[in-house]
Amino acid sequence: MARCAQGCDPPIVALRCAIVDDKPEFLEAARNLLERQGVAVVGLVSSAADAVERVQELAPDVTLVDVDLGGASGFELARRLPDTQVILISAYDEEDFAELVAESPAAGFLSKPQLSRRAISDLLSRR
C-alpha cells in the first residue's frame, strides 16, 4: 500500500458521542441515526444520576444531554461536566430555552428533529 505524500487529507476520525436522555426509545433512535452518519456512539445513559460518572468513564468528544431528564435538569448536568463538550437537546425549540442556554456552559442547543452529525460538528466548530 502506497503512503500518502504531502497534501493528502488526514483520515476521517469518527466523532465519539454519548447521549443522556430519560426516554429509551429516543436513545435508540438517536444512536441509529447518528451511527448511520458515521458518529461513534460510545454510550447511552438513561438517568441524570448515572450521567456524570458514565460520561467521565466514556470520555466522549461530545455529550448530548436532554434538557428535561425527568425531574433533573440538563442545564445542571452540563455544569457538572466542565471537562466535557455538552450539547443540550430537546423536543422543543431553542427559543423556549434561549436564556438558559446562553447562561449554561454548554456548546449549544439542538432541537431533537435537527439532530445530525453536521449540526453537532457545526456547533462544536463555533467554540
Residue map of PLM features:
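Non-catalytic signal-transmission and effector/linker regions of two-component phosphorelay proteins
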Residues: M1-R16, L115-R127
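Active-site residues of response regulator receiver
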Residues: D21, D66, S90
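Acidic di-acidic motifs
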Residues: D21-D22, S47
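Two-component/phosphorelay signaling modules centered on CheY-like receiver
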Residues: P24-G43
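Acidic, metal-coordinating helix/loop segments flanking the phosphotransfer/catalytic sites
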Residues: L44-V62
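Acidic catalytic/metal-coordinating carboxylates
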Residues: S47-D50, D68-E76
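As written
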Residues: V101-G108
